[in-house]
Amino acid sequence: MPAPPPACPDVQLVFARGTGEPPGVGGIGQAYVDALRAQLGPKTLDVYPVNYPASSAFGDRIQFARTVIDGIRDAGMKVEATAANCPDTKVVLGGFSQGAVVAGFVTAAEIPEQIPPEYLEFIPKPMPDEIAEHVAAVVLIAMPSDRFMRDIGAPPVVIGPSYVEKTLKLCAPDDTICNGAPVGGPSFAHNVYGVNGMVGEGAAFVMQRL
């Protein structure tokens, strides 16, 4: 007899790691997972690390676009599959740094108009509107600012209308990646989310929406 399908979790976390981190959810992502598990209590949680390169090749716009597109496609497929196969499961979407860009773009209602026509065939289509009903919360940790994105030649992230009220953006005050500073290397503050209380804040935001 075939093995029975795995039980659907109460909560499905789809999380994209930050730039240059090894496969998995990354260090900040793991701190967020731990905070979420601590607050969920008896609820079951499954963690899906988004499968994408998380490339640090910011100077190569084509390569950077490819890594983000790979992440958007993989994360979107997991969210849609969960909605189809486990309709009662609450999906939580999130990411850190470059991973937050991936997660943010997954919510987009339309492909950014800044995308050159020759690249459109490679861009994943936005998720169907009804998928938003299955997504309880979106937590974006240290998402690069609009200024940062423009400076590297990428379109800024626009959260889809169906996700705006369920999205939390976390940015430490001195984090130059997300606070609107000109593009440059990350400041010390970019790596303190695991200890500055913000992952707990993100977990609490999720709990309010389950």
Where are these predicted regions, by residue range?
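Hydrophobic membrane-targeting and insertion signals
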Residues: M1-P2
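Active-site catalytic motif of lipid deacylating hydrolases and related acyltransferases
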Residues: P5-K90, L170-V199, A203
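The alpha/beta-hydrolase serine catalytic core
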Residues: D129-Q208
